[in-house]
Structures are given as C-alpha cells and as structure tokens.
Amino acid sequence: MKFNPFLEAIKTYESGKDMDLVAKEYGLKEVIKLASNENPYGTSKKAKEAIINNAHLAHLYPDDTMSELKQALAQKYDILKENLIIGSGSDQIIEYIVHAKLDHSKAYLQCGVSFAMYEIYAKQLGVKVYKTPSLTHDLNELYELYQKHKNEIKVIFLCLPNNPLGECLDASAVFEFLEKIDEDCLVAIDGAYNEFASFKDSKKHINPKELIHKFQNAVYLGTFSKLYGLGGMRVGYGIACKEIINAFYKLRAPFNVTNLSLKAAVAALDDDEFVQKTLENNFSQMKLYEDFAKNYKIRYIPSYTNFITYFFDEKNSTDLSEKLLKNGIIIRNLQSYGLNAVRISIGTEYENSRFFEEFSKNF
C-alpha cells in the first residue's frame, strides 16, 4: 500500500514509558517515572472533585463553545474569550499553526533542539525545517536564518522555556526580536513551562495580553499538563488576535476536549495553593539535582522548567537509561534528539532520592 511520501521523513514521537508496563516487564514492585515532566504531586484536590462530581455527564457531548473554561482563562490573562482556542493538549494548537500557515513550498524556523512535535507536524506536510547551529535559543542566529530565508519561513517556534533543554530567554529580548519579524510570519511562543520560568525569574515571564496586543502575528501556547497536573486529561490552549483564532477554528474538529477535561481545567485554575506548592517544591528539589551534577562533574543547562537535562561526554545515555529502567527509574533518553543526554523530571523528595541512589550505583 502506498502512503503519503512525506511520511518517510517523519520519526514517530517517543513518549515516556508506562509505569505498569515497566513493572510487569522487569518484575518490579516499585516504579518511579521521571520521564514525562508530569506533576509529581498528582492532580489538585479541586480538579479531582470536579472530575468526580461531573462523572455522570460522561455520556454527553461537551459544551463545544467551551465557554466556562474560556471565561476562566480570559479572567486569568485579562483578555477576551474571542482571543482563545482550546485544544486537546497544546500539541493540537501546534497542529493548527502548521496547517494554517505552512505547506510543502514553505518552511518554519526553530532553535537547534526543541519540542519534537513542531517538526513532526511540519514534515507531515512536507514543510522544510530551518534550525540554528546552537542547540539553545540564540536570537541572533534565529534572525540571521530568518533574514536569509524569509520568503520561505512563515512560522517561527520559540519554546520558552525550551523542552527538552530547559533554558529560557528574557521576555524583553523576545519582544525586541518580534519587532523585526514581518507581519505575515506567525511566531508561536510555546509557554508550556512558562509559569515555572516566571516563578524562578520574573524577567522570563511572557504576558500573553501584552504579546497579542503588540504583535498581531503572535500566538501564545499554554497547557494544563505540567503545572496543573492534568496530563491525562489533555487540555491546552492558544491565545492570539481574533483573525488567527478564527483561522484555527476552521481546522478544529467539534467536541475535541471532553466534558471532564474541561471541568477539571476550570477547577485547576482555581487551586492556587496546589500551584504554589508545586512551584516551590520544584525549585527546592531542582537545587539538589544541580548539586548532584556538580558533584559528578556532569554538564547541565540551568533549567527554568520542571526538569533538568544532563549531558555526558563518555557515559552513554542509552546504557544509563536502560540500567535505571531495570531498577525501576524511568527517565527520558535524548538520543532521539541526537544528544548523548538524559532529561529528568523533578519528582517528589522520595522519588528524587531514589534517582540519586540508582544513578550513583550505575554511573
């Protein structure tokens, strides 16, 4: 059977391994997952209650206007509901961006290593990809490539902070960069981890309201999968001017987010105590990972997220990941990104201590 020839160039996305499957495969009683940047403290109490209290609605299609969640997000960011689109994870908004602006005659731009789904969605359409020589975001390199290929480049993805490396740019530098980009080039600011960056350093905070008011060609992406502990519910959103949102709606399938997911997201936005606890614990535990890396002379990039990436010179990241896996610790090997590195999600105090214990045995 023949398929779209563009598919030959696509590598399937490598997701984190399932804990139950790992336990069965290796005969383990305990498995700790530090691979997918999920919230180690689970789901907020308010979100759980919303799921339970609305479970009886599971047989009904959701409100396709998603009015309640849009209103909550509009209030959070001080924007209009018309500036919002809700997706099944922010991945779906990335898909809308690619389909709205790109085809096989066009290109998009990103830094050397960034979220894999940008490239996967683009290559589905045969879109050309331009990447900077530097792995992390270098705005000078990005602008140089943009200037050289601006007739082709119609989308720029900035992942701030960057997944899977963890670095982040100051918001002021990002806004200066946007000033130099043509209005017909859509710039996507992927803020999946921006709440973490904003907590660590206010200079990294991207204000979506300010962004879309200053730049009619910008879209901000947010998610409930990380800080808000709803990775299993699949809820993300895009914030942009009405013209962009209206274009995305032409690509959206009806009822794309479930009843329970919408209710859980609204409740999660109202749980400030859970959010604050997550942020504070994340960065207190992050310090332990930084100290651990220094002790073992492991290279890392200071992270503004809920994960840290270790880079190796001699040790093989695949071998290390497999050894840890057999001992019940799941981390993300970054060989699929062309890196001899591993990404480790920041867990609970106990989970992190178990990682340090097993890593020390196998390094």
Curated annotation (Swiss-Prot):
GO biological process, one term: L-histidine biosynthetic process
E.C. code: 2.6.1.9
Positions bearing N6-(pyridoxal phosphate)lysine: K226
GO molecular function terms attached to this record: histidinol-phosphate transaminase activity; pyridoxal phosphate binding
Entries under InterPro entries matching the protein: Aminotransferase_I/II_large, HisP_aminotrans, HistidinolP_aminotransfase, PyrdxlP-dep_Trfase, PyrdxlP-dep_Trfase_major, PyrdxlP-dep_Trfase_small
Gene3D superfamilies: Aspartate Aminotransferase, domain 1, Type I PLP-dependent aspartate aminotransferase-like (Major domain)
Obligatory cofactor(s): pyridoxal 5'-phosphate
Keywords: Amino-acid biosynthesis, Aminotransferase, Histidine biosynthesis, Pyridoxal phosphate, Transferase
Pathway(s) where this gene product acts: Amino-acid biosynthesis; L-histidine biosynthesis; L-histidine from 5-phospho-alpha-D-ribose 1-diphosphate: step 7/9
Catalysed conversion reaction: L-histidinol phosphate + 2-oxoglutarate = 3-(imidazol-4-yl)-2-oxopropyl phosphate + L-glutamate
Subunit structure: Homodimer.
Similarity comment: Belongs to the class-II pyridoxal-phosphate-dependent aminotransferase family. Histidinol-phosphate aminotransferase subfamily.
Descriptive protein name: Histidinol-phosphate aminotransferase
UniProt organism field: Campylobacter lari (strain RM2100 / D67 / ATCC BAA-1060)
